[in-house]
Regions:
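N-terminal helix-turn-helix/winged-helix DNA-binding helices
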Residues: 1-3, 42-75, 79-81, 90, ...
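Short beta-strand segments enriched in small/hydrophobic residues
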Residues: 15-20, 56-72, 181-189
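Short beta-strand elements in bilobed, periplasmic/extracellular small-molecule ligand-binding domains
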Residues: 87-98, 204-236
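Flexible loop/turn connectors
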Residues: 240-300
């Protein structure tokens, strides 16, 4: 019978380390290399922790883990509701890991998942670049999919959205309405959120194609925004603040494009507070088609 000392010898670590790694003691930190060596040795030797039944004998509840960057955005709430509805229909429970775009929190959840043994993992956003290899390793043993424009270096399955085309369609709509000088407001254009940049690029290129190079003002929020804990009104507030800054510095535009609907709603409020009429004075376009974008505006 294989024992923990056999695993320790094969992995080149102490028996205590084997015990803590395989029992997922989260108050003790081990390097990723050590964890992988121990888990690999245990798998190769067929070692099972005392008291743990064989997976075939152990009837666990079926569960899917979903990594989500925020639960304050209506877009992600709609996404989670859709995932949960389909999962429940098929007898699966859903465990949501709200990372709040915090790399340390994401790493903690990745460690916890090893003990959960879920039937599948869904990333509703790109994994943090530091953990791409860890996610790829996990995908070899657990079905895993990314709902986003995955990093080009990643080999994990993904449902990709053509954000360049999304940006192009937004620009084309404004051009068809006769707009020639416009502004595009967006959350931070960081490496991790490079799909945001794709949407901006598609938008700008369509204007350039129409012979209007230099007619698009890009106004992005500061990168520090993504490092703060998101609040319910984070994207709305960004849209409001960026629009105010455009108005205050005298920028010339007849339309504003928001990276998403919540930013566009913030833009509308900022314009109306400045006594500008929407769409008579300035047009506003968003993206996502969330429920709130169709509500007639009223102050409750």
């Amino acid at each position: 019978k294989v024992t923990s000392s056999d695993v320790a010898e094969k992995a080149g670590v102490s028996q205590a380390t084997v015990s803590m790694v395989l029992n997922h003691k989260y108050n003790v930190s081990f390097s990723r290399e050590t964890v992988e060596k121990v888990e690999s040795a245990a798998r190769e030797l067929g070692y099972q922790l005392p008291g743990h039944k064989n997976k075939k004998e152990n009837k666990k509840e079926k569960m899917i883990v979903v990594f989500c960057p925020t639960i304050t955005s209506p877009y992600y709430v709609m996404l989670l509701q859709g995932i949960e509805a389909v999962a429940n229909e098929r007898g699966y429970g859903v465990f949501i890991c709200n990372t709040q775009r915090d790399a340390r929190l994401e790493e903690k959840y990745l460690r916890m998942i090893r003990a959960m043994a879920p039937q599948g993992i869904i990333y509703a956003c790109n994994p943090h670049p530091d953990y791409i290899s860890q996610v790829e390793e996990m995908a070899r043993s657990i079905p895993l999919v990314i709902i986003s424009n995955k990093e080009k270096i990643s080999t994990v399955d993904a449902i990709n959205q053509d954000n360049t085309e999304v940006g192009r369609l937004m620009a084309r709509h404004l051009l068809d309405l006769g707009h020639r000088d416009v502004a595009f407001i967006t959350p931070p254009l960081t490496r991790r959120q490079w799909q945001r940049s794709k949407r901006v690029d598609g938008f700008v290129r369509e204007f350039e194609k129409a012979g209007l190079s230099g007619h698009v003002i890009i106004r992005a929020a500061d990168e520090s925004v993504d490092r703060r804990n998101p609040k319910t009104d984070s994207e709305y507030s960004m849209g409001y603040a960026l629009t105010r800054s455009l108005l205050e510095d005298g920028s010339r535009f007849t339309a504003i494009a928001g990276q998403n609907d919540m930013m566009a709603i913030g833009a509308v409020d900022a314009l109306q507070d400045a006594r500008l009429r929407v769409p008579k004075d300035v047009s506003v376009i968003g993206c996502d088609n969330i429920f709130y974008s169709g509500i007639r505006r009223v102050s409750l």
